[in-house]
UniProtKB/Swiss-Prot annotation:
Coiled coil: none annotated. Its EC number is 2.1.1.-. It comes from Rattus norvegicus. PANTHER family: BICOID-INTERACTING PROTEIN RELATED, RNA 5'-MONOPHOSPHATE METHYLTRANSFERASE. This is RNA 5'-monophosphate methyltransferase. GO terms for biological process: negative regulation of pre-miRNA processing; pre-miRNA processing; RNA methylation; tRNA methylation. GO terms for molecular function: O-methyltransferase activity; pre-miRNA binding; RNA methyltransferase activity; small RNA 2'-O-methyltransferase activity; tRNA methyltransferase activity. O-methyltransferase that specifically monomethylates 5'-monophosphate of cytoplasmic histidyl tRNA (tRNA(His)), acting as a capping enzyme by protecting tRNA(His) from cleavage by DICER1. Also able, with less efficiently, to methylate the 5' monophosphate of a subset of pre-miRNAs, acting as a negative regulator of miRNA processing. The 5' monophosphate of pre-miRNAs is recognized by DICER1 and is required for pre-miRNAs processing: methylation at this position reduces the processing of pre-miRNAs by DICER1. Residues 53-275 form the Bin3-type SAM domain. The lineage of its organism: Eukaryota, Metazoa, Chordata, Craniata, Vertebrata. Belongs to the methyltransferase superfamily. Interacts with DICER1; the interaction may be mediated by RNA.
Length: 285
């Protein structure tokens, strides 16, 4: 969802734009929909932790038809990370599909902000492979049709993989503990694999402080949240204990101290060992 210099360990809770009220119109990003997110959290920081061959090993070619790998990117912002993930996973070397050894990748990318979605559509370098839509993933009624319509194009009922990159905090702050649990229940039901980048608790405090600086009301749920503390561990607990998933791999932490956690639905057949990143750093503590 939104420099290239490593952030200090004092853990700048969010990047400069996210913590500087002057960088945004007041209240302009209550859902993390920052207009220039990737300038401060560049895609490369995530990509260096994710093995390029990951999707090929999780979803090897099967049969002559080689149906495409289907992915859902929740909270895609203006699409920079979506496009970077697509190119990163397409080929381990030069961004070109190796014919005969890999499957096509099709991504449905959604965000709650129509302005960011329009920017993503206009700037998309892979329009045949990436579809951008405006969608509130927490709206149980409005999400049904676009998700099922995309899947039905390929004769599928679930995605192969769902990406939730730095979105859990915004769901949590805007919808409370119940909303976070409902979100995790829903996305885990949609896929075989789930890649989550949870924001740590210090980011919650920074988001609340930013609203106070802007003279706005605090997030309605912030002070009443019972799920708090080590958010990576909390999300692991919810997904593994309540929603039939298992933690398959932690690929390490970004320079802004967010872990990349890959979960696998327990009913999913494990095809090959998950490759580790050559730059793997730390786990969830």
């Amino acid at each position: 969802m939104a420099a290239t210099q490593e952030l200090s360990k004092g853990g700048v809770e969010e990047a400069v734009e996210e913590d500087d009220p002057a960088a945004l119109k007041p209240g302009a990003a209550p859902f993390g929909n920052f207009p220039h997110y990737s300038r401060f959290h560049p895609p490369e920081q995530r990509l260096r932790l994710l093995p390029p061959e990951l999707l090929r090993q999780l979803f090897p070619p099967e049969g002559p038809e080689r149906r495409p790998i289907l992915g859902l990117d929740v909270g895609c912002n203006s699409g920079d990370l979506s496009m970077a993930l697509y190119k990163h996973f397409l080929s381990p070397h030069d961004g070109e599909t190796s014919s005969g050894t890999s499957r096509e990748l099709r991504l449905l990318c959604c965000d709650i902000d129509p302005v960011l979605v329009e920017r993503a559509e206009n700037g998309c370098r892979f329009p045949d492979a990436l579809t951008f839509i405006t969608l509130d993933i927490m709206d149980q009624e409005s999400r049904k049709v676009p998700l099922s319509s995309f899947l039905s194009q390929f004769g599928r009922s679930v995605f192969d993989i769902v990406f939730c990159m730095s979105v859990t905090m915004w769901i949590h702050l805007n919808h409370g503990d119940r909303g976070l649990c409902e979100f995790l229940a829903h996305v885990s039901s949609l896929c075989s694999y789930l890649l989550v980048e949870p924001q740590p608790w210090k980011c919650y405090r920074a988001a609340a402080r930013r609203l106070r600086k802007l003279g706005l009301h605090n997030f309605d749920h912030f002070r009443s949240l019972a799920i708090r503390g080590d958010m990576a561990s909390q999300i692991v607990r919810i997904l593994t204990q309540d929603h039939g998933m298992e933690l398959a791999c932690c690929f390490g932490n970004t320079s802004w101290d967010r872990s990349l956690l890959l979960f696998r639905a327990k009913h999913t057949e494990e095809t090959q060992a998950i490759p580790e990143s050559s730059t793997k750093e730390t786990g969830t503590d």
